[in-house]
Amino acid sequence: MEQLHKLETMIAGWMKDLPHLPRNFTKWLAENAWWLVIIGVALGVLALMTTLSAMTVGSAVLGALGAPVLGGAFLISSVVSLVGAGISVVVEAMAISPLKTMQKKGWDLLFLSTLVSFAGAVVSSLVSVNIIGVVWAALAAAISFYILLEVKSYFGAKAKLAEKSAE
């Protein structure tokens, strides 16, 4: 967890000069994060099932067309995506209860989920030699980290102080 906090501090340093979201919006996001994550977990489970189906059909089709090497790369890339997304969905599901009570643990789990999702997307894109996929993964991670860092002050022991300073 110590390494996670070091990484959090480093990313926060990169984002410190960016403009902030409106206070009312960040407060709304923080207070409603738990049910937004429930929706994300449900959609994530559907995405996992879709990826599993695509793996089965895609590998069979590519293999039948005489492209076993391409089929193998597709299969490896899909497995990496499936594992990364699966871990991310499980970590997000673990974050729901702490997010509901505005605990820092919930925020930390969302941060970890974003890291896992980013790492899985990058590895999957590199295996399939999809450089644009790496760019999109970096863009999605940057937006996710920005939003997470904007709502961070509402979670944990410092949350009460942040709420008082907003009033």
Whereabouts are the PLM-identified features?
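Topology signature of small-to-medium multi-pass alpha-helical membrane proteins
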Residues: M1-E167
